[in-house]
A protein has these predicted regions:
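Active-site phosphate-binding strand-loop segment of PLP-dependent enzymes
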Residues: 137-171
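Conserved coil-to-alpha-helix start sites within the AMP-binding
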Residues: 96-100, 117-120
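Short beta->alpha connector loops at strand-helix junctions that form conserved
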Residues: 115, 134-139
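Short glycine-rich anion-binding loops that position phosphate/pyrophosphate groups of nucleotides
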Residues: 39, 97, 168-171
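Conserved PLP-anchoring active-site segment centered on the Schiff-base-forming lysine
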Residues: 106-125
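N-terminal small-domain helix-loop-helix segment of the aminotransferase-like
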Residues: 2-3, 7-94
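A short helix-loop-beta submotif of the ANL/AMP-binding
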Residues: 127-132
Length: 171
């Protein structure tokens, strides 16, 4: 019933490790989790109060996210990055993993993926049926690909579209 592309995917190693550590905790083992993306910080009280104040809201939101929130994000990033970001180019989503997946499914071309990288990016590219071009990064370059390395990939075929997944840290 499932497409072969789904059947061939391996389980996420981070989710598997989290599952094993949870089982060990149930058995009484003391586990220190350093890798799972769960925030160790409490949700700020202002956010908790706003969520309470808006709990009655049950309508679908605009696809790009709330206009006021997008404007606030654009203004904040514009201030931090000394570049004028437009709220029309800001998308608010349910999480970065979902947005990265959607981007790769919609993108027609090859994905340039620095290595090491987060475990989800390559499977997302595979599900999007995109070819992956991996660039091995080094400590000397702060785990970022160099301009020359990126250029080398692109010059192999200038007629293709390329999407470079670049974030810091490379997760």
């Amino acid at each position: 019933m499932l497409k072969n592309i789904i059947k061939d995917l391996k389980p996420s190693s981070t989710l598997k490790i989290n599952e094993i550590s949870r089982e060990l905790e149930i058995k009484g083992e003391k586990i220190f989790k350093f890798g799972f993306g769960q925030s160790p910080f409490q949700v700020p009280l202002d956010i908790v109060n706003e969520l309470k104040n808006n709990a009655h809201q049950n309508k679908y939101l605009p696809m790009q996210g709330l206009k006021e929130l997008r404007e606030t994000v654009a203004k904040y990033v514009s201030t931090k990055k000394d570049y004028n970001y437009n709220s029309k180019n800001v998308i608010i989503g349910p999480g970065s993993k979902e947005l990265m997946f959607l981007l790769q499914v919609l993108f027609e071309g090859e994905i340039i993926l620095p290595a090491p990288s987060w475990v989800s990016y390559a499977p997302q590219a595979i599900l999007g049926r995109n070819k992956i071009q991996t660039i091995q990064t080094t400590r000397e370059n702060n785990w970022f690909p160099t301009g020359a390395e990126i250029e080398q990939v692109i010059l192999k075929n200038k007629k293709k579209n390329y999407l470079l997944i670049l974030n810091s840290p490379n997760n």
